[in-house]
């Protein structure tokens, strides 16, 4: 890397050297020499030497089976360490300004002052600030929890080594510790031997909260409070809750038969247990700190005649939390539950802790109150008694199946065969009725019983424990009403947000019409109390129509939903189902939020954070603080300095781009007769299905083709062979078409003046930079029948044409010109990803020759898949 990134370069070099020592100790000098030869050949091949590229291919082809796994692990492990060094660099004191965006909030406040935004308006926007991140297990973090814990400790060592005044012995000790951690990682199994259960995934989510967010959220709020104090003259109210967490882990049953109502109940108990456990650690720390004697009458009343009143109150809370852990333990084990008071509501913690806080301030000890006690109070608001709120997600047809079976049993016809109007009439009638609908003697099928039992589990919980009920593949108003009816029948005592997820191109285009129909129903308007959540699906719409067309459909749907809710005086929260990759809506958070339609963030931000992106954005407390800063500044900016309304000619051209790109995408994916055989042969799609990643099957329908593949394995497969097809196909072709039609000037204007369009092009540039056409060609030659080669060649030629079109519109000479750090980061990884790709192609070739794949080859293949995912940084 160039000298600009000297500190990062130094850390990468040190970690690489320590990894080399570990490899030598474990496998001998010969294997280390082999790894080093491959690395050097990869570097010179990347610099343009065809001779060295051929030598690299031959070197990898000649590896005996017993060397494949250690060589693959060497490069995979190095990429993990590089990611760690890079993540650390973004929070280190040596980080360059254009890399870190160290103080997004202060930058925003300067911008607001220059734009004459009043402090009153800013204060109001801060009061309304609402960031809800929803942790999800898919595409499933490739790295195991074991590895992640080691990487967190490696980060701590890097932090120590950065201190200027570190003593020689301390440096030596820290470097030794680093080497131990790298050796531990090397000798641990990098790949799970069995698929994680939904319970394992939920525990992974809780580990993220414990290791990072428990510290990161109060730290962010402390910094945010200081910035507000400086800019507005008033800080953040103590009870403010601008950030909170939800989760799909253990609640998302869409296409995952392993998430049952029993699992959901267990995950919710576990979530409460983990919350009580973390609060108990906080309370024990506060007991050791708050030894003060002076207090207000209110605290004296709570503490009784104890000499140390604060400790007395905290000890009461310690008992409450201890009893809570005991009770939840018994419930999870199915044992007799002790009859003791336990934590069920956050106010049980908040009220006594807040009384202590006010008392300390009143008695002149504000500096003490504003320390650990304030952090705990912030946590109580952010995490509640349940740590994370659990969403329930289910596919729309599972609800209509319940009603269909029920109506047939009742002898009133088949719900599924009714018209939409008849369904709505029936549902509204039943929702307004005071008598129960489910007959006592009815014995439904197991699938239907499971849906009913899930609704009953929801009804058992407190409202605070739950997020929203998300209906995937929502298409009609009756899909939403059906869930409300099933929850009512289950005895749900509170109003739960029922959130339709519009995810295909057609469904996005119809979303406004569906919501208008719902808002026209009196029962519905009365029930929702002027609040509506709608989820925008990014992954399936992109898989259905390509990224350009899907992006415009998402934008148009958001705009239409904002308009209809404004007209009806309904507060709208848009829930974004983004992933880590562009093919699933992934973009740098700040840019993505500022490219949304005006007013679309008025109701706050609710967004999924997926598997591996959770680690990159939230995996360390300091990194989480940076991420929250970016989210908060982007939402405030979008609401206080909204982006321009798109001009009509921009909209018209976007319609053309959308239509042309969708047609170009579908002509290949649906219209090309060789496409499916090519996809199956040129990518590890079939092998990926066997990888023990997430708890969820790779296909919605195990017998279906590409169309039944989930969006995640679809994108994951293409990113493995470096063609990354779903993330660009159709977009550049549409841009070139518009240039040919004489619209270049208009495209350039859109690029300059419209954040939505410039962000699209920026995302495309990043994808193009990650593509490696030469590598894709190597996969073709090694793995596909010669009859399929012309299709691969056509796609790669299209990619080159598309890159020229995008650079032309942006007036750039090369990709990522405006993002040198991003470009450098990808370039650094390529040297290590390329050998993994060649290894993977070789392994796929060897395993496909065998009737029964040897465990040796299967393990090596899994390591390459995990390594390439680490190198590409966003798996799916």
From Swiss-Prot:
GO cellular component: cytosol
Source species: Aliivibrio fischeri (strain MJ11) (Vibrio fischeri)
Similarity comment text for this entry: Belongs to the PEPCase type 1 family.
Function: Forms oxaloacetate, a four-carbon dicarboxylic acid source for the tricarboxylic acid cycle.
NCBIfam families, alphabetized: PRK00009.1
Any GO BP: tricarboxylic acid cycle
Alphabetical keyword list: Carbon dioxide fixation, Lyase, Magnesium
Protein name: Phosphoenolpyruvate carboxylase
